[in-house]
């Protein structure tokens, strides 16, 4: 089961972040009824819509596998107007965490197919505290203003020997991503993980007082 939540104000809270687990294994290249493929924005394990979403003390993971085989595979599509995550594990490979909104225009026909494809692009504010986020290609991406506070960022080894942590698509005049007092440590070979690359022209991402391994 893949929860799709569209409420004004709600809380998801587990008893233990390592024992309360939401899991699914849907990849963007999986077939979709009547269509060629699922696509990135229908691959989520958990969809957070609505007004204010609070998520605490649990794990959300997408176990579809490596993006080279299954395509993008979201653990969380964070699309609520305000998102707060505390003590949450987000595990995946390519495109683990999407922080809405989408860019205005897609580059591939039907590339945004999903719940928000034809919706207005509404700005969101997101805050992640003491979270563990794992992936290998563009695994934190999107157009939100988002703060990552004392989080552990875990870039995973990828067969291309290159890992990109972020891919912001920050709208003009928005702040983008801020990582504060975070630890970046994974299993990539030395010097193969990059802090980010732009998904759109105004992409913004800042790292402050973070600890980076080789």
What are these regions (language model features)?
Residues 1-214:
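Sequence-level preference for short, compositionally simple segments enriched
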């Amino acid at each position: 089961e893949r929860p799709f939540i569209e409420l004004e104000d709600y809380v998801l809270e587990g008893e233990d972040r390592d024992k309360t687990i939401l899991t699914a294994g849907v990849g963007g290249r999986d077939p979709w009824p009547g269509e060629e493929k699922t696509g990135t924005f229908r691959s989520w394990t958990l969809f957070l819509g609505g007004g204010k979403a609070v998520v605490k003390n649990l794990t959300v993971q997408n176990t579809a596998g490596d993006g080279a085989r299954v395509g993008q595979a979201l653990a969380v599509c964070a699309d609520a107007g305000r998102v707060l995550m505390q003590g949450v594990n987000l595990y995946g490979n390519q495109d683990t965490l999407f922080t809405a909104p989408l860019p205005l225009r897609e580059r591939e026909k039907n590339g945004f197919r999903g719940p928000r494809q034809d919706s207005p692009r509404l700005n969101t504010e997101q805050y992640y505290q003491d979270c563990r986020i794992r992936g290998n290609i563009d695994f934190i991406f999107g157009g939100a203003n988002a703060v990552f506070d004392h989080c552990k960022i875990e870039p995973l080894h990828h067969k291309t020997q290159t890992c990109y942590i972020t891919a912001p698509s920050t709208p003009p005049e928005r702040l983008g991503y801020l990582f504060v007092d975070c630890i970046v440590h994974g299993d990539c070979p030395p010097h193969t993980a990059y802090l980010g690359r732009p998904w759109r022209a105004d992409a913004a991402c800042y790292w402050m007082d973070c600890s980076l391994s080789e």
